[in-house]
Amino acid sequence: MRIAGVNLPLNKHAVIALTHIYGIGKTSAKNILERVGIDPARKISELNDEEAHSIREVIAEDYIVEGQARGEQQLSVKRLMDIGCYRGLRHRRSLPARGQNTQTNARTRKGRRKTVAGKKKAVKK
């Protein structure tokens, strides 16, 4: 089944399968299924076309998903960088923006280690 341009896994429960759509987490998935009246424990393969269509409608009218959600997030980060606030500077320098320590951690954000050559020991005669 395809919703919002994403192929949902047929063998998973509806709640879990909906979280494969960017911009929909577990809480949003539960709310969507509750509004449509579908049991969250049902598998995606068990849903009929009418139920799938109603899920598509709810997502289209109430949620920002996939490309639109990614674009909005990129724009908000770009706005922070443009206004020059602290969080924007941290994004620009590829450092953690939420106050984490960086002396020993933050390898994911900083990337691979850039080796700096140490002092060479003087040869004693």
Swiss-Prot record:
Residues 107-125 have a biased composition (Basic residues). One of its GO terms (molecular function) is tRNA binding. It comes from the Bacteria. One of its GO terms (biological process) is translation. GO terms for cellular component: cytosol; small ribosomal subunit. Keywords: Ribonucleoprotein, Ribosomal protein, RNA-binding, rRNA-binding, tRNA-binding. Gene3D superfamilies: 1.10.8.50, 30s ribosomal protein s13, domain 2. The keyword Phosphoprotein does not apply. PROSITE patterns: RIBOSOMAL_S13_2 (PS50159). Belongs to the universal ribosomal protein uS13 family. SUPFAM superfamilies: S13-like H2TH domain. Residues 92-125 are annotated as: Disordered. This is Small ribosomal subunit protein uS13. The keyword Iron-sulfur does not apply. Located at the top of the head of the 30S subunit, it contacts several helices of the 16S rRNA. In the 70S ribosome it contacts the 23S rRNA (bridge B1a) and protein L5 of the 50S subunit (bridge B1b), connecting the 2 subunits; these bridges are implicated in subunit movement. Contacts the tRNAs in the A and P-sites. InterPro entries: Rbsml_uS13_C, Ribosomal_uS13, Ribosomal_uS13-like_H2TH, Ribosomal_uS13_bac-type. Part of the 30S ribosomal subunit. Forms a loose heterodimer with protein S19. Forms two bridges to the 50S subunit in the 70S ribosome.
